[in-house]
UniProtKB/Swiss-Prot annotation:
Residues 125-275 form the Exonuclease domain. This is RNA exonuclease 4. It is found in: Nucleus. Keywords: Coiled coil, Hydrolase, Nuclease, Nucleus.
Amino acid sequence: MRKTVRKNKQVKRELALLEKEKEEIESFTKVSKTVENKQSINSNWNVTKEKIKNKNNAYQKKKEAKLKLKSATPYTSTKVIEEKKPHIKDFNQLCQEHNIISPIDDNLVSPTQKEIDNLNESSKFFSIDCKIIEIEGNKGTLGKVCIANQNGQIIYEKIVKPMDKIVDFRTKFTGLTRDKVQREGTDFLQVQKEVEKILRHKILVGHDLVHDLKNLKLAHKKKLLRDATQFTKFFNPDTNSEDSLKSIAKRELNFSPDNWDPNGKRDTIINVILYKQNQKEWEAFINNKFYGQPIDKN
């Protein structure tokens, strides 16, 4: 019995030793694998470091070569500086550049009634400019009207005798005087009738047309109006709002005379040039505004 107990104890001790040896072997195996992995990582990192080093060396050589070339070659700018054209000062020059033959003089253009009857069909669009004088009640009224056809030809220009008493001829802005109005003026109602007949159902180009039509006491379909104050391309770039005809002409046509005197013929023709130069984009703008069609700038 005692021999059997001793045998069992000895077997247990041997089993315990075997278990311990097994654990030591497993532990050693894990350590070996870890070392192998580290060696593999270190090997990859060394390869990467070598590649980076080679790239840096190549970059440094290129940089040094460029510096040598730069020091050996005198500096010359490759940037092309666009020279600004001098502003056009002479209105006749502007007309010539845009193939418009329309003499600017002080003579009014008063077509006969028969000619007026045929003017509407003679042009696809008309340009208009109105000069406003002041009457009693601190109100504005029509003092002069000028109309040009699609070719920039002045077809109608008349001074208007208002129905109310004139308080201020606003000569600085209209060029009108008491003598001119009394001597050359035509009754307002006659001018209104003639202008309506000329413009009926036609595209109308101008600057601040709402104001002009108000003083003419005429209605015109909004979709037929080409008002430079409403065309966003002509907005003042600093304020993003409507701009004066003088500023638009300077920016769009490079036209900037030394003296911008009140001249209805000049302003009317400028409106024709502006419209013809931007017609495709302007019509696309109107199409989008009234019909909701996308603007095609191509």
